[in-house]
A protein has these predicted regions:
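Short aromatic-cysteine micro-motif
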Residues: 1-113
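Extracellular adhesion/carbohydrate-recognition regions
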Residues: 1-34, 121, 127-160, 164-165, ...
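C-terminal, surface-exposed recognition/capping segments
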Residues: 40-43, 47, 67, 71-80, ...
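Surface-exposed beta-strand edges and their flanking turn/coil or helix-capping segments
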Residues: 50-52, 59-60, 132-136, 222
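Short, low-complexity, polar/charged sequence segments that are solvent-exposed and flexible
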Residues: 54-56, 139, 226
């Protein structure tokens, strides 16, 4: 079961098989309504940030997050959970004398949504094969990797180049999703990076946020170049609770 424990390091793929599918299972083990953080939940937070700050550059508006460490090349260097608990549902960096860039950050109660450690982003599959076609989960379908079954193709493709997000696609059924279709060398548009591997001959999945050495590329950094079976010492997960409302 995936849990958030104050004073403990986030789980990583260093010692555990934290693939996207396994993170999904660990979240579901918490009970009804619990699932892995998804592209749809991310979009809600992005829009809230944009409305509140008139910007998508979370690092400049809220705090850099844990992104300026020097990597040791061998361990999970993520900082422990809970440093921003004193902020409640507020926003900002660690109130206990933290150094911006080397301490936890929180936006509306979501701690280290960017920086610290990559987290898997669920309910989005990317069919690379020279196209980077984006598929998102349809309500009621089974959530799975490496498939289009139960997923809807959006009317645009994930960016074919790495860089700072400079344009987003619009799908009439999912206008809320801010998935980058273009990238540039300038961070003035959103301040958020995008990574891709569109020549890969198969399906790819997404990660969010960046890690402890990500620097200014962190934020709502979308990495769309991982295979579903990937695990690493800087990959983790984030759980999400979706209220179970019955419709009469």
């Amino acid at each position: 079961m995936l849990s958030s424990i104050a004073g403990a390091k986030p789980a990583s793929g260093l010692t555990q098989n934290l693939t996207r599918a396994n993170v999904r299972k660990l979240c579901a083990n918490r009970g009804a309504g619990w699932e892995s953080h998804s592209i749809f939940a991310m979009a809600v937070t992005e829009w809230l940030l944009m409305i509140e700050y008139a910007s998508l550059d979370a690092q400049r508006k809220v705090g850099r997050g844990v992104c300026d460490f020097t990597d040791d090349g061998k361990t999970n260097m993520a900082v422990v959970t809970g440093a921003t608990s004193g902020l409640g549902n507020g926003s900002g960096i660690d109130p206990n004398g933290g150094v911006d860039g080397k301490c936890s950050v929180s936006y509306r109660g979501e701690e280290n949504l960017w920086g610290n450690i990559w987290t898997w982003l669920d309910k989005v599959n990317i069919l690379a094969k020279g196209q980077n076609e984006v598929f998102v989960h349809e309500i009621g379908a089974t959530v799975a990797d490496d498939t289009t079954t139960g997923y809807k193709s959006l009317g645009y493709h994930w960016s074919h180049s790495n860089g700072y997000q400079s344009a987003f696609g619009i799908d009439p059924e999912h206008p809320e999703l801010l998935i980058p279709t273009e990238a540039s060398g300038s961070d003035v548009f959103t301040g958020n990076y995008v990574w891709q591997n569109y020549t890969y001959n198969g399906f790819l999945v997404a990660r969010l946020g960046g890690e402890w050495i990500g620097g200014s590329s962190c934020g709502f950094y979308l990495y769309g170049g991982s295979t579903s079976g990937s695990r690493n010492r800087d990959f983790g997960g984030r759980w999400l609770y979706v209220p179970q409302t019955k419709v009469a």
